[in-house]
C-alpha cells in the first residue's frame, strides 16, 4: 500500500499507541515494520492469533514475557566467524531463558485450545547444553570460576597471593607504626603502599611510588610485597588470557545454532506483539473485526483512536453501495469521519484491532487513496483548487475496483457552480468504475445527486441547533442541511430580515423540512439502537462475570482434586509401607501358627481400598432373607477367602464357625453361604503351592502360559505374596517364550520386589528361558 496514505492518516502515531504494551525490542521492531496487506490469509492469521491470545488471557490473565534485547546483529557476527564478548553472550542468554520459560508455560497450559499460537510456541528451540554453557556469565558481566578449571585455579592463586600481601602489610603496620604518618594501607598506581614519614624513608626497604604534596609522606611498596605484586600481575594476565579462551570456546559452541537462536528471538517478539495487541484491546475496549470477502464494511460505534473523547458512530458501506457523500457545513466532523473510515481499514489490514463494537466487519482493499486537507504547494505557486485537482488527477489514474477512495471537500476552491458540477462528474466516473468512495462536500447540489443516483447514498453530521454546536454524530442516509437562518435568529438577527431571506428560497425550505423530518426519524432510530446496545453491553458484562466465575470454579475444583489425589497417594504409600512391614514380620519367623496367618491376611485385607458396603444393598438383603444361614451350612469367610462350617448361633446374632483347625466368631456380613447343590461351584484362581520338607524348604510353581498380560501379572502378585506368607525360600515361574511380553513383565516385577534376593532362567533341562527361578531373602 502506498506510503502517502499512511502519512495522511498518521499511521505511525497509531502504532505508537501499542508501544507501551511491548516488553521486547524484537516486538518493537516488528511493530515498526508493520504495514497493511491485501492478502486475506495473512489478515485472517493475525485476527486468529489475537482471538487465541484473548482466550489465553482469560485462563492466564497475568501471562507475560521476559524483556529481551535485539540480537540480530549478534547472531550475524557469529555466522561471520566473530567471537562474542560477555555483553553479547548475556543478550543470547536472556533470549534462551525467555524461550525456555515460554515453552514451559505452553507445556503447562490447560483449558485453552490454540492453533495459530501453538505453531509459534512449538517452533521454539530448546538448548539445555548451551544454556548451561552460558551460565558461566553472570548478570553483572562477570565470568564465573566454574567456567573452566584453569580459570578457577588462577583465581585461587590470585586470592592466595592477595591474602599474603594483606598479611604482610598488616604485620608491617604493627611493626613500623611509629614510622608511618597513618596506620592504613594506601593505593598508588594500582599497588599497595604504606604512608611512610619522609624521615624514615630509608628504614623501610621497597619501591617509592609517590610523595605527598607537602613532601612529608613517602608512599612505599615494601620489598616483601613487590615480588608478590609481580606474581599477582602475572596471574592477572593469565586470567585475561583464559577468559578470552573461554569466550572463543563458547562462541564456537553457540555458532552452529546462531540462526535458530535468531529465529527464536523473532518468535518471542511476535508473541510479544500479539500480547501487546490484546493489552490494547483490554485498555481501549477495542475488538478484532470480522473480515468481509466482498469489500463490505460495517463499523459499529467506531472511533478515531487519536481523537480524545471521540464520538462513536456507525458506518455501513454495503456491497452494492459505491459512494457515500457527506454534505453539510464545515467544522461538523466530516473530515474526521473520512479519516476514521480509512484508518480503521488500514489498522485492520495491518492485523491490528480496531476501536469499534463486536460485529464490525472490514473489507480488503489493495490500495487506499485520499485527498484530504490543504496540500497546496507554495513552491509550485498552486492554488487550493489546483493543488487538490493535481492530486485527484493522479489518484484517478491509479484507482481500480480493489481500491478505497477518500475525498475531502471535493470541488472546493473554485466557482461554486462549476465546483459542484465537477464534483458530480468525478463521483459519476467513480460510480461507473465501481470504486468505493467516501466524499465530503458543502455543495447543496450534491444532495440531489445522492438522492437520485443509484448506489450512491447521502450522509451528514448532526448539528444541535439548541446549543449551536456540532454533535459529531454521523447520520447515514440523511443529507446535510443549512442551519443559517436558525443560527442567525438565535444570535439576534431581526426576524424581518430572516423572513425576507427565507421567502427568497421557498423551494430550499421545503427540502430542508424534508431533511429535518429525516433527521428526526434517524435520531429516534438511533435512540432505540442505543437502548438495544446498552442491553447488549449489560449482557456482555454478565457473560464475562459468569465466565470468570465458571473458570474460577473449575480451577478450585481442579485444586481440590489435586489435593484429594495427593492425600490418596499418601494413604496408598502408608498402606504399602504397612503391608511391607507385615510381610517382613512374617518372613522373619521360621514357623507360623494358623491363627497368625489368618490375622496377617486380615491385616492385609484392611489395607485394600474401601469397597461399597454390600450389606446395605436392598436386593442382596432380600436374597439373604430367602436363604437364612443355619447350623451345618458351608460358608466362605470374606476377609480371607477360607471355607468353613457354621457350628452354632450365639445369642447376640453372631455365629460360631469351624474354619480348618480354627474356631472363629463371625457376623453374618462377614461370610457368604456356599450353595453346593443348586449351583455349579465357581472355579477360583488357585496358585499351586507344593510344600516339601527338603533342606532348602518348601517350593512352589506358577504356570502363566496362555494368560493375558494383566491377568498374568495379577496372578504373579498373588502367588509371590502367598509364597512369602508360607516362608518359601524358592519358587518357579513358568511363563514360556512366546512373544516375550509376559516374560518381560515377570522380570520387571521381580526387579521391583524388595523381598527377592535373586532370579534367573531355569536350566535347559528344566525349561530354559521359558521359566524363571526366584530365590527370596532369608
UniProtKB/Swiss-Prot annotation:
It comes from the Bacteria. Disulfide bonds: none annotated. Belongs to the DNA mismatch repair MutS family. MutS2 subfamily. One of its GO terms (biological process) is mismatch repair. It is an enzyme of class 3 (hydrolase). Residues 702-777 form the Smr domain. The keyword DNA-binding applies. This is Endonuclease MutS2. It comes from Streptococcus pneumoniae (strain 70585). One of its GO terms (molecular function) is ribosomal large subunit binding. Pfam families: MSSS, MutS_V, Smr. Endonuclease that is involved in the suppression of homologous recombination and thus may have a key role in the control of bacterial genetic diversity. ATP binds at residues 328-335. Its EC number is 3.1.-.-, 3.6.4.-. SUPFAM superfamilies: DNA repair protein MutS, domain III, P-loop containing nucleoside triphosphate hydrolases, SMR domain-like. Homodimer. Binds to stalled ribosomes, contacting rRNA. Keywords: ATP-binding, DNA-binding, Endonuclease, Hydrolase, Nuclease, Nucleotide-binding, RNA-binding, rRNA-binding. HAMAP family: MutS2. Transmembrane segments: none annotated.
Amino acid at each position: 500500500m502506498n506510503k502517502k496514505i499512511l502519512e495522511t492518516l498518521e499511521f505511525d502515531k497509531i502504532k505508537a499507541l501499542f508501544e507501551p504494551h511491548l516488553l521486547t525490542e524484537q516486538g518493537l521492531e516488528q511493530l515498526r515494520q508493520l504495514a497493511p496487506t491485501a492478502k486475506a490469509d495473512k489478515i485472517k492469521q493475525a485476527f486468529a492469533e489475537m482471538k487465541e491470545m484473548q482466550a489465553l488471557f482469560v485462563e492466564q490473565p497475568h501471562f507475560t514475557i521476559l524483556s529481551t534485547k535485539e540480537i540480530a546483529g549478534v547472531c550475524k557476527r557469529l555466522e561471520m566467524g566473530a567471537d562474542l564478548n560477555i555483553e553479547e553472550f548475556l543478550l543470547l542468554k536472556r533470549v534462551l531463558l525467555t524461550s525456555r520459560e515460554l515453552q514451559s508455560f505452553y507445556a503447562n497450559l490447560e483449558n485453552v485450545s490454540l492453533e495459530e499460537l501453538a505453531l509459534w510456541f512449538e517452533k521454539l528451540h530448546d538448548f539445555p547444553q548451551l544454556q548451561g554453557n552460558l551460565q558461566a556469565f553472570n548478570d553483572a558481566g562477570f565470568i564465573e570460576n566454574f567456567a573452566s578449571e584453569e580459570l578457577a585455579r588462577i583465581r585461587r592463586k590470585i586470592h592466595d597471593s592477595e591474602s599474603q600481601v594483606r598479611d604482610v602489610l598488616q604485620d608491617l603496620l604493627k611493626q613500623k607504626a611509629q614510622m608511618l604518618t597513618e596506620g592504613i594501607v594506601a593505593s598508588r598506581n594500582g599497588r599497595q603502599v604504606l604512608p611512610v614519614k619522609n624521615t624514615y624513608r630509608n628504614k623501610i626497604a621497597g619501591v617509592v611510588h609517590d610523595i605527598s604534596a607537602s613532601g612529608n609522606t613517602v608512599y612505599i611498596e615494601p620489598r616483601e610485597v613487590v615480588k608478590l605484586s609481580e606474581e599477582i600481575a602475572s596471574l592477572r594476565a593469565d586470567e585475561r588470557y583464559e577468559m578470552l579462551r573461554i569466550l572463543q570456546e563458547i562462541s564456537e559452541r553457540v555458532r552452529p545454532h546462531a540462526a535458530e537462536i535468531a529465529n527464536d528471538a523473532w518468535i518471542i517478539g511476535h508473541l510479544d506483539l500479539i500480547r501487546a495487541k490484546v493489552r490494547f484491546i483490554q485498555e481501549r475496549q477495542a475488538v478484532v473485526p470480522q473480515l468481509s470477502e466482498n469489500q463490505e464494511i460495517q463499523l459499529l460505534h467506531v472511533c478515531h483512536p487519536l481523537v480524545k473523547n471521540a464520538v462513536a458512530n456507525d458506518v455501513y458501506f454495503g456491497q452494492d453501495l459505491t459512494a457515500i457523500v457527506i454534505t453539510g457545513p464545515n467544522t461538523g466532523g466530516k473530515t474526521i469521519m473520512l479519516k476514521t473510515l480509512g484508518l480503521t481499514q488500514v489498522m485492520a489490514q495491518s492485523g491490528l484491532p480496531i476501536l469499534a463494537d463486536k460485529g464490525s466487519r472490514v473489507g480488503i482493499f489493495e490500495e487506499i487513496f485520499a485527498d484530504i486537507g490543504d496540500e497546496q504547494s507554495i513552491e509550485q505557486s498552486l492554488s487550493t483548487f489546483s493543488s487538490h485537482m493535481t492530486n485527484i488527477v493522479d489518484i484517478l489514474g491509479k484507482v481500480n475496483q480493489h481500491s478505497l477512495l477518500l475525498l475531502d471537500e471535493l470541488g472546493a476552491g473554485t466557482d461554486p457552480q462549476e465546483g459542484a458540477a465537477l464534483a458530480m462528474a468525478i463521483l459519476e466516473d467513480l460510480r461507473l468504475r465501481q470504486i468505493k468512495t467516501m466524499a465530503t462536500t458543502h455543495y447543496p447540489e450534491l444532495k440531489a445527486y445522492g438522492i437520485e443516483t443509484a448506489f450512491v447514498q447521502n450522509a451528514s453530521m448532526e448539528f444541535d441547533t439548541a446549543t449551536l454546536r456540532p454533535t459529531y454524530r454521523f447520520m447515514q442516509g440523511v443529507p446535510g442541511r443549512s442551519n443559517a437562518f436558525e443560527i442567525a435568529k438565535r444570535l439576534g438577527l431581526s426576524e424581518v430580515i430572516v423572513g425576507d431571506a427565507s421567502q427568497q428560497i421557498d423551494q430550499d425550505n421545503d427540502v430542508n423540512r424534508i431533511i429535518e423530518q429525516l433527521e428526526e426519524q434517524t435520531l429516534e432510530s438511533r435512540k432505540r439502537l442505543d437502548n438495544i446496545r446498552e442491553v447488549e453491553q449489560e449482557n456482555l458484562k454478565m457473560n464475562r462475570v459468569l465466565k470468570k466465575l465458571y473458570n474460577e470454579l473449575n480451577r478450585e475444583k481442579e485444586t481440590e482434586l489435586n489435593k484429594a489425589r495427593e492425600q490418596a497417594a499418601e494413604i496408598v504409600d502408608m498402606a504399602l509401607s504397612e503391608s511391607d512391614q507385615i510381610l517382613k514380620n512374617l518372613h522373619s519367623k521360621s514357623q507360623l501358627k494358623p491363627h497368625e496367618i489368618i490375622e496377617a491376611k486380615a491385616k492385609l485385607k484392611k489395607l485394600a481400598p474401601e469397597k461399597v458396603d454390600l450389606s446395605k444393598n436392598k436386593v442382596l438383603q432380600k436374597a439373604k432373607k430367602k436363604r437364612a444361614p443355619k447350623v451345618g451350612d458351608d460358608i466362605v469367610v470374606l476377609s480371607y477367602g477360607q471355607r468353613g462350617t457354621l457350628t452354632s448361633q450365639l445369642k447376640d446374632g453372631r455365629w460360631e464357625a469351624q474354619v480348618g483347625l480354627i474356631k472363629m466368631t463371625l457376623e453374618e456380613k462377614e461370610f457368604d453361604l456356599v450353595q453346593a447343590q443348586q449351583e455349579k461351584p465357581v472355579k477360583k484362581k488357585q496358585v499351586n503351592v507344593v510344600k516339601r520338607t527338603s533342606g532348602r524348604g518348601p517350593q512352589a510353581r506358577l504356570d502363566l502360559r496362555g494368560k493375558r498380560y494383566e491377568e498374568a501379572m495379577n496372578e504373579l502378585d498373588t502367588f509371590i505374596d502367598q509364597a512369602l506368607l508360607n516362608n518359601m525360600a524358592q519358587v518357579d515361574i513358568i511363563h514360556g517364550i512366546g512373544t516375550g511380553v509376559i516374560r518381560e513383565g515377570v522380570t520387571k516385577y521381580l526387579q521391583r520386589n524388595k523381598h527377592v534376593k535373586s532370579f534367573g532362567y531355569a536350566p535347559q533341562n528344566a525349561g530354559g528361558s521359558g521359566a524363571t527361578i526366584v530365590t527370596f531373602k532369608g
